[in-house]
Amino acid sequence: MLAAVAVGAVGLGAVFVDGAPFWGADGGGPPALLPGLAYLVLAILGVRMTWRRGAIIAGVTAGLFLLVAFLDSLRAPDSQSHLGRFFDSMLAGEAMDIIVRKGQQNLSILFGNYKLALLVPVALVFVIYVLARPTSWGSRALQRSFDSAPTLRPGLIALLVTLTIGFLINDSGVAIPANGALIAVPLIITVAVGTLLDEARMTGATRAARRR
């Protein structure tokens, strides 16, 4: 319970800083962060994710986004962030134009380089496969890490959820999973290697004790 509270507090703080109009004013960050955070908190509490719970999380995320955008739209035009301006565009019937333009920007970045166009979906599918079957593809060290740190696997799944949503809804889409991987992959390798080293030390200590 304490772990879930700690994760929720840190995560909500990050969402607030990222999405608050007077700070980050990021329209694409909170909708990507909240579902991953919700999944992680539920997983720590032992609550199984279902389609219904996923739909509720999506609805709450969309509602909070619209609420923040609405509150920002109440400020003076010169003080509004793009969240408030987006809400005003919804009232004016121009929101779809913005969504289409951002989608086109994302697609142009993705398909402007065919290597990236192939790499991103393949990489996401590979990560999903490894998380589903962590003993495959030589990743037994990852399974051992999952065994020694029960929150590691839910954390990686939450990260995957956040990066995937961020990839889909941001106009800089392909940069989201790329930057996330730059941070996550070295940390994952460090955890896996640390687990193997701990096991090696324990094995060595056991053998030394038997020889005495």
Q: Which residue stretches match the model-derived regions?
A:
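Membrane-interface helix caps and helix-loop-helix hairpins in membrane proteins
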Residues: 18-27, 168-175
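Hydrophobic membrane-spanning alpha-helices of multi-pass integral membrane proteins
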Residues: 6-15, 33-37, 58-65, 93-97, ...
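Alpha-helical transmembrane segments
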Residues: 40-44, 66-70, 125-136, 187-200
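Aromatic-rich transmembrane-lumenal/periplasmic boundary elements in polytopic membrane proteins
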Residues: 28, 54-92
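Membrane-interfacial, low-structure loops and terminal tails that flank and connect transmembrane helices
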Residues: 1-2, 135-150, 201-212
